[in-house]
Amino acid sequence: MSQQKGNKSRINVEIYGQQYSVVGDESTSHIRMVAAIVDDKMRELNAKNPSLDTSRLAVLTAVNVIHDYIKLKEEHEKLKESMTQKGME
């Protein structure tokens, strides 16, 4: 189910077997994609750590996703700097 209110989208998604109502500025397809990635990451980590309860699994998922985000952000900054340097030559 999805609704639009102003520029906000409200959509129900399932993450790791739980239903969540998510509200965001992005399209419903974007919100679904984000939810699917979170679900995939949680299932991937659960396969490696089956003894973790859901709360710990969620925190570990958040830590891993933020780690990936920071690495990508650093790589992006290096690429921008490299392009700036090449533009100055």
Swiss-Prot record:
Subunit composition and interactions: Homodimer. Interacts with FtsZ.
GO biological process assignments: division septum assembly; FtsZ-dependent cytokinesis; septin ring assembly
PANTHER family: CELL DIVISION PROTEIN ZAPA
Localization, UniProt: Cytoplasm
GO terms for cellular component: cell division site; cell septum; cytosol; plasma membrane
Top-level taxon in the UniProt lineage: Bacteria
Coiled coil regions, renumbered to chain: none
Family: Belongs to the ZapA family. Type 2 subfamily.
Lineage: Bacteria, Bacillati, Bacillota, Bacilli, Bacillales
Name of the featured protein: Cell division protein ZapA
Keywords: Cell cycle, Cell division, Cytoplasm, Septation
Originating organism: Bacillus mycoides (strain KBAB4)
Pfam families reported for this sequence: ZapA (PF05164)
Function: Activator of cell division through the inhibition of FtsZ GTPase activity, therefore promoting FtsZ assembly into bundles of protofilaments necessary for the formation of the division Z ring. It is recruited early at mid-cell but it is not essential for cell division.
